[in-house]
């Protein structure tokens, strides 16, 4: 039986590390499934940068941000250790812009569209997010929350 593959939205990764979040338990369990090689995890370079930004931000982390050194260590040990497949943006940048134009999307939506364009190329079993409304009008994307996978 082939393992399912899951392309992660950044919010799920953040919740996996934020023990105060109501989404922490399911997100952390899903992350553990990747680390234990039970499912195939896929992320983008963008996820790494967004995760760094959020984990070092005092307001996003409820006054308890991680230091740059702590985040560097976390990223290297968890996400850059070979457990996740990380895709670059080079092949999908034009497609991202084309989709945003076609769907008349603007501002911060471009970042969601960038992840979406990568899922079109790499075709994971699921795209996992707690922000399903951000992606619901996009074709060829099977959305799940961590709760629906675990």
Language model regions located:
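Short, well-structured N-terminal submotif of metal-dependent ribonuclease cores
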Residues: 1-43, 60-69, 150
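Conserved glycosyltransferase catalytic-site signature
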Residues: 10, 45, 109-113
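Active-site neighborhoods of divalent-metal-dependent phosphate/nucleic-acid chemistry enzymes
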Residues: 83-130
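Structured helix-beta-strand junction loops
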Residues: 37-38, 81, 138
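Short beta-strand segments at enzyme active-site cores
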Residues: 42-45, 129
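Helix-adjacent hinge/juxtasegments
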Residues: 54-86
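Acidic, PIN/NYN-like endoribonuclease modules and their adjacent C-terminal/linker elements
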Residues: 1-5, 113-150
């Amino acid at each position: 039986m082939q393992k399912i593959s899951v392309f992660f939205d950044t919010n799920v990764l953040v919740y996996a590390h934020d023990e105060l979040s109501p989404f922490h338990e399911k997100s952390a369990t899903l992350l553990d499934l990747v680390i234990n090689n039970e499912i195939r995890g896929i992320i983008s370079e963008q996820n790494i940068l967004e995760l760094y930004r959020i984990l070092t931000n005092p307001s996003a982390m409820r006054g308890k941000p991680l230091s740059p050194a702590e985040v560097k260590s976390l990223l290297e040990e968890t996400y850059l250790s070979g457990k996740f497949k990380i895709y670059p943006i080079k092949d999908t940048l034009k497609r991202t812009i084309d989709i945003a134009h076609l769907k008349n999307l603007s501002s911060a939506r471009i970042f969601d569209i960038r992840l979406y364009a990568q899922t079109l190329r790499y075709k994971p079993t699921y795209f996992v997010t707690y922000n399903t409304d951000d992606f619901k009008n996009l074709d060829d994307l099977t959305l799940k929350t961590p709760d629906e996978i675990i």
